[in-house]
Amino acid sequence: ALIPGQPTPRSALTYLAVETVLQAVDRLEVRGRDSAGLSVWVHLDEADRALLAGSLAGRADPLLRSGSAVVTGDGVCFVYKHAAIVGKLGDNGTALRLALRDDADLHAVLALPSAAVTVLAHTRWASVGRISEANAHPVDSRIAGADDAGPFSIAALNGDIDNYGALAKQVSYEPDERGITTDAKVIPVLLSQRLAQDADPGSALCACLGDFAGSMAIAAQSETGDEVLLAVKGSGQSLYVGLGHGGFVVASEVYGLVATTSRYLRVGGAAWPGATRQGTVLALPRRGSGTLAAIRRWDGDGVLRPVEPAEVRTAEVTTRDLALDSAVHYLHKEIHEAPSSFRKTLRGRLRQGAAGVQVGLPPSSLPTEVRRRISDGRVREIVVVGQGTAAVAAQGVAQFLRAAVGDRLVLTAMPASEFSASCLRPDMTDVCVIAISQSGTTTDTNRSVDLAKDRGAAILSIVNRRDSDLTTKSHGVLYTSDGRDVEMSVASTKAFYAQVAAGCLLAIELGRELDVLTPEREASLIDGLQRIPGQLLALQESEELLAKIAADVAARYPYWAVVGSGHNRVAAAEIRIKLSELCYKTISTDAVEDKKHIDLSAEALVLVCVAGAPPGQVSDLVKEVEILAAHGNTPIVLCDEGTEQSWPTDLVVGLPLGHPEMMWIVATAAGHLFAYHAARRIDAVAEPLRVALARLEGAVDHGLELSAALPREVLVPVIDVLEDADRGHLRGVLTSETALGLARLVLQPARPGLGPEAFSFQATQPVDLARVVLARAIDEVGRPIDSVKHQAKTVTVGTSRDDADVYDNDVVVAMRDAGVDLHRLTLPVLRVVRAQARVIKRVTGVTYYRVGGAEEAGTIRVVRKTGSAAGLASRADHGAPLMGSKRRVAELHTARLLRGRSDGRVVLVVPEQDCNRLSHLCVVHVELHERCAPRDLVAAMDSAGDRMAEIVAAVTETVPSFEPARLGELPAEDVLLAPVEWLAERLAAG
């Protein structure tokens, strides 16, 4: 317990706040736990501050390590930290609680009448700076040997500050390998310097954010006020501000705050509309804490952005979802929850009919109108899309659809990003898109759905999260499980099975609707579905065998492959994803029969999925496995229970029997379990190296000189790893470069010539060198399992398909109606047309010309006229030379907005190409909006040339600056087409 003795009601609330933050750390450390820190900033009135005079002087620490205390202008800041390269989830929280419990000074200060606290904590996956108490966050603004330039400040960081080195020089901070080397250090230093200039805290952090490069989330505090400052920049990080009855709770993931409140405000790092810089900054004061009205918010430019009530969201995850129970990792827990997820997906969707059990989907899942469009033939094609694991689930759903509806519909499965890139048509009213997403917020999938729906496609979605973005875009929704089946692990498992279950239900329903499925066939498929949960449960009895095989082979083989045939191609594809995600392997996947034609000589570890194979195919598959084994490969076979003796390998796992067409689902589950245990085996290789690094850092903290030889206790674990490598056990995970680096550390004391200069690493001292070598080795073989390394180190985004809407404007429609072949319009031309369409009020007509001869001396002839152009005589009605503005468009190969010299008509001239040769010109007669938004005018000018730059240059010849907002005050036609000098005079005159 944190509370000593009998606390006052006021201090009891304080201890509750501290424990709330510690519980959030406990939940968040699944994403990183090599160190953690917590500050308790106690705000005191003047009388209580006087009582502290000199009492905490002995706790000053320039490195702000655990147990340090800093007396500030408004109270005192206590700091507690724990760093452990070797450890498990929960260790950091335990260490911090013990330090807090045993701190008599803290308890005495919290008992003072005026004491009020803010608590800031952080759990770290180190990317910059060694793992140590000094580098654990929060860090402070003080620089050893320098006078304090401004108010005392502290900060914690998620993400990386890419220009940390340059900023450290700017603030005259020299990182010390014995001290603080994390990039987070520049945050409080810069913030303090900004505050010294009398800046408002929020404005000061906005200014700092503009100096930082990278993707980051920041929490900071200063003695200039009692508010906590937050900042987010870039697309790789976010923060969530929980609105609780007792105050604000902030976390980098929603599950960090749900124990206190389910209501939250998300803080993202993208640029606000109209802002020139990315980022958002918030100030959370103690007064009004927990209320939306108390929050102040700025964009990256420092402009206030009020918080609206409509921005508040409700979390779906609960504390129950966060409990690990007896599992070591969330991934393992979630694989074991798969039978329940599958069963919940079937529940309520199977009904007893006259002919037995039947699928019965409600109109909310399969709307009546969509059902009619499919049954009467208006829908002729179904496309199943998803991204990542959901894209593989889409392949499985498409298989069930083929089995259920036969050739009545064209069936395709593909990644959503590919669908939006190459498969969209102007008219998609004959298409039904089935979109699969665990979260309902996948960028690629949702963008594809938007584009298909705009073109008339029917949209059905299979999604886990209720009220998510995808559900609002869909005509019908099939929720997986109970619509809120949370996955904490980054690698998705149980959602995959549930998505397949929902897709199979939909396939059976459509098969009956189209009168393709016989009652017997439907009953067989439904029976197979109902047996899957039991099979998944029975599979867990084979986990010990899967774990043993993984322990024997996972670290031995550098090359891996997963193969399958028929339905098992889907299993192979999904197992490949999990093996790649968890084990950081580049893995191939092929049909079993193709493997011998591709890389048979790789001597690889090959996972062979053959469960449910037709009896007539089994003997052929056995021969394929024999060929693999004969060429030095190591096959692991996932087959039907009872056939284990048929396969020419000792590594065989029999799977619980079920419907042959659904055995691939069970094979996938077996592959997931194998992937989990393979990752654990690989990660175990890193454990002795973590021990070595922890011992080294401990020795440094206790005075080991950087130039000293490495202690024997550091080298012993390294020797153990090298001996394992010498036996061939680590050939698949330890590169030769890393192994040589480790060997040189061991040989260095006996071979003086193998000092730091013998390495390619930039290290000048033996201890520095050992840090680099050990850290690289740990990074090479460490496997976090519930997290994915690249998601912690880099920015991950989805495709936005910004150019997928280039056909979605009235100008393109008018050209199409006039006979223009839209496929002959280049993407740069379409982008210009899209930009110009934003300033065009309406299209009045089109003149379509054919271009003949060489472009330099070609001719044009009218092919077709529409609208207002139909009554206009043209010199090219019977052919004429290509000249004037049309010739200029032909030379530039880009669209141009022009005004006729004689008639004053405004037209958009668009070139059409055939095999890179100009074939046609389309002159679109248009009427512009009287006034346009400045951003639309700028976009139109920038799309087709440098007119905007010319305007700015001309205006600033006579006035010091130019504000683009002025463009909106003038007629759009003048802005876009009037002579630049004339326009500049009007703008300069104001």
Task: For each feature predicted by the language model, list its residue ranges.
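Conserved short alpha-helical segments that host acidic/polar catalytic motifs at enzyme active sites
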Residues: 1-380, 519, 537-543, 549
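A SIS-like phosphosugar-recognition module
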Residues: 224, 235-239, 244-347, 352-990
